[in-house]
Curated annotation (Swiss-Prot):
One of its GO terms (biological process) is tRNA methylation. S-adenosyl-L-methionine binds at residues 182, 210, 215, 231, 293. It comes from Neisseria meningitidis serogroup B (strain ATCC BAA-335 / MC58). This is tRNA/tmRNA (uracil-C(5))-methyltransferase. Keywords: Methyltransferase, S-adenosyl-L-methionine, Transferase, tRNA processing. PROSITE patterns: SAM_MT_RNA_M5U (PS51687), TRMA_1 (PS01230). PANTHER family: TRNA/TMRNA (URACIL-C(5))-METHYLTRANSFERASE, TRNA_TMRNA (URACIL-C(5))-METHYLTRANSFERASE.
Amino acid sequence: MNDYTQQLQGKKDYLKTLFAGLDVPEWEVYESPDKHYRMRAEFRIWHEGGEMFYAMFEKGQKASGASMIRCDRFEAASEAVNRLMPELIAAAAQSPELKKRWYAVEFLSTLSGEMLVTMIYHKRLDAEWMQAAQALQQQLDISVIGRSRGQKIVLKQDYVTETLKVGNRDFRYRQIEGSFTQPNAAVCQKMLEWACRTAEGLGSDLLELYCGNGNFTLPLSRYFRQVLATEISKTSVSAAQWNIEANRIGNIKIARLSAEEFTEAYTGKREFKRLKDGGIALTDYAFSTIFVDPPRAGIDEETLKLVSQFDNIIYISCNPETLRANLDTLAETHAVERAALFDQFPFTHHIESGVLLKKKIL
């Protein structure tokens, strides 16, 4: 058993133990490549003895020379990131403006190799820095953003455009710097395909909470008459709207509401001008299914009451502990029909999972 298989087996065993006592079918398992799977990576820039290099630090330890790990390569990151790393550091080392007080760097790449690089500084960025960064951008064929306290300088664009293949169709996604995107594109495609398979035959309308940039919304829209998706982040809503238009999808509407706010709107406790302004009338929808991909804290108690009202629940989770806690409640009204482990984060303790629940016939 190699290192990758061994760590994946550990995750399978953990899920079986955690969900013991719940009626859960055999876990479907979706593997990751064992290297070059992360589309995002971030490093400190370490300056020592006239040299400059990428660095990380031992987990749980204060950032210092004693805990520092030099990273000339990073196998977890995409091949595009690994190709760029030495070129970027070498080019920046030749420019006093780029090198001085350069503190950290963030890479955001795509499967096609498009690259956005955010250079973070402990100094004010001026016209000389911009001129040097423009030259760097042109030399390396990348997009550069400069950040410092109170400053964000976008030289060309602050996003990349990812293309993910789901079944027989390609979907284009604008991924904006600083906003959440799934880091493992290969596994993300498997997650999208799994979600679409679970949605087959459910029909009617779909409600999605926590939709982000529309990652799941776009491919799932093919299986429903109408889709209403909610998201609180303005940046993510903007990206989702662009993604809907770019993919020429006509049956999705986005509401900029938190899950808690939508619950209040759905139950009639509050009216929201944002819904009215968006031309959204909840009475126009006949929801058969709800899709949720909540943050690590899971679904709050009031939203869970809302979720339990739907016939079908597709639940993607980045925290199996809160998924288990939520399922303890949902199991009173629903049965788990499918369960999947997605190895989004190889060689870490993090586990991404998905379940399909259907309302019990009492």
